[in-house]
From Swiss-Prot:
Residues 362-414 are annotated as: Disordered. Residues 1-22 form a transit peptide. Coiled coil: none annotated. The chain crosses the membrane at residues 119-139, 155-175, 227-247, 269-289, 312-332. NCBIfam families: yidC_oxa1_cterm (TIGR03592). This is Mitochondrial inner membrane protein OXA1-like. The gene is OXA1L. It is a multi-pass membrane protein. GO terms for molecular function: membrane insertase activity. Keywords: Membrane, Mitochondrion, Mitochondrion inner membrane, Transit peptide, Transmembrane, Transmembrane helix. It is found in: Mitochondrion inner membrane. Belongs to the OXA1/ALB3/YidC (TC 2.A.9.2) family.
Length: 431
């Protein structure tokens, strides 16, 4: 009998070992720290925590513990492993921050933060400033920013360098304008003759049409138009306006302009309280007028008016320039200096020969030089060589002013007599 009981006990133990692992997940404990003890002790703790359940209380009794730890583990199937007591390590977890301090060092976090704060505004500030601008103004702002980023220069030097680049691109167009102006001045005597003939035949529509046709042929033959002197205004006008609005917009909306200057004009967003930049701009403009505009204007009927008007503008512009931001002077002053260098360079004979410009003729009083067209000149200056070609050489007997007037009057009378003779011949032929 004892042998049979012993065999049954072994079989029950084997069956319990086979079935019990399948129920092990019901009492899993994922904590890092596990308490040592047998499975019976763990089951008792579970049953004690769920003592409110009647069935659990039943299994908590000593008489039913053997049934709970039986081979099929029926006691475990009727209770839940739900504890209201928080784990021991829960008070150590306040958030996710403890992981970041271990994974990412503080030095890297500070470096990324400072880099994002310093680099991102520098990249986006010009784009934000140019967002609400017109296309030419926005394009010019991006060009200044590209020069600033590529060269690493301060804003004042970037504006000056961009001015030189833009003015350098317009040099071929200005040279073409200068050559066309010379050709137009050579045609001026012929055009004046045609105008006189047309004025005498103002009542004859056919004669007026013929005169206009001959003028068009002359313009086409020499490749010029009456609007040739306006090329400088058409080109330089939009450039000046675009620079003005672009730089002023950047001075208002780009924060780095506050430290983008040098010397006494470090802050480019404010006016110059020392009045040095406004005075320099006005003086360079006046020098530009005296050295470039006065040359070759002797034959132009509006030469005196233009020169006086430019002088007045040079003096009246000082109060206006005082209220302008310093950043604008980086363009304005550079543009004036560029025009001066451009005019002085064209005075050299070797440069004129290289550019295929007409030679300068020496005068009795001084040696004239080629005119340098200014950005906003409504009348293009004439070169003295063209004036010398227009006017025939005067003899020594006609050096005084009275013989000059007599010769001019006699030439006009002869011209009128010839036109009257032609009209009489035309009438006889028609009859």
């Amino acid at each position: 009998m004892a042998t049979c009981l012993r065999g049954i006990t072994k079989r029950v133990n084997l069956l319990q070992r086979r079935v019990y692992p399948s129920c092990g997940h019901l009492i899993r404990d994922d904590r890092d720290e596990t308490k040592s003890g047998s499975s019976d002790t763990m089951i008792r703790e579970v049953l004690a925590r769920n003592g409110t359940n009647k069935l659990s209380s039943m299994f908590a009794d000593r008489h039913y513990q053997s049934f709970a730890t039986g081979p099929l583990g029926l006691g475990l199937s009727s209770c839940r492993h739900m504890s209201s007591t928080p784990p021991e390590w829960s008070d150590k977890v306040d958030g996710i921050d403890f992981v970041a301090t271990e994974v990412v060092p503080d030095e890297i976090i500070e470096a990324v933060t400072t880099t994002s704060q310093a680099v991102v505004p520098a990249i986006n500030e010009v784009a934000i400033a140019a967002a609400d601008s017109a296309f030419p103004v926005a394009a010019l702002q991006h060009l200044i920013d590209a020069v600033h980023s590529f060269t690493g220069l301060n804003w004042w030097a970037s504006i000056a360098l961009t001015t030189v680049l833009i003015r350098g691109v317009t040099i071929p167009i200005l040279l073409n304008q200068l050559k066309a102006t010379y050709k137009l001045n050579v045609l001026r005597p012929q055009l004046e003759e045609l105008r006189q003939e047309m004025s005498t035949k103002a009542q004859d529509p056919e004669a007026m049409a013929e005169g206009q046709r001959r003028m068009q042929l002359l313009f086409k033959e020499h490749g010029v138009t009456p609007f040739t002197p306006l090329k400088g205004l058409i080109i330089q006008g939009p450039i000046f306006i675009s620079f003005f609005f672009a730089i002023r917009n950047m001075a208002e909306k780009v924060p780095s302009f506050k430290t983008g200057g040098t010397l006494w004009f470090t802050d480019l967003t404010t006016t110059d309280t020392t009045y040095i930049l406004p005075l320099l701009t006005a003086v360079t403009f006046l020098i530009m007028v005296e050295s470039n505009m006065q040359e070759g204007l002797e034959g132009n009927p509006v030469a005196g008016t233009m020169k006086k008007f430019s002088r007045i503008i040079a003096f009246l512009s000082i109060p206006v320039l005082i209220g302008i931001e310093k950043a604008l002077f980086c363009y304005w002053l550079t543009s004036n200096l560029f025009t001066l260098v451009y005019g002085l360079t064209l005075r050299r004979p070797d440069v004129r020969k290289l550019l295929n410009l007409p030679d300068v003729v020496n005068s009795s009083t001084r040696q004239p030089s080629p005119s340098s067209p200014l950005p906003f000149s409504f009348a293009e200056p004439k070169d003295q060589s063209v004036v010398a070609q227009e006017k025939p050489p005067m003899s020594s007997e006609s050096s005084s002013s009275v013989p000059d007037r007599r010769i001019s009057r006699s030439s006009v009378l002869n011209q009128r007599i010839r036109t009257l003779e032609r009209q009489l011949k035309d009438r006889k032929i028609k009859k």
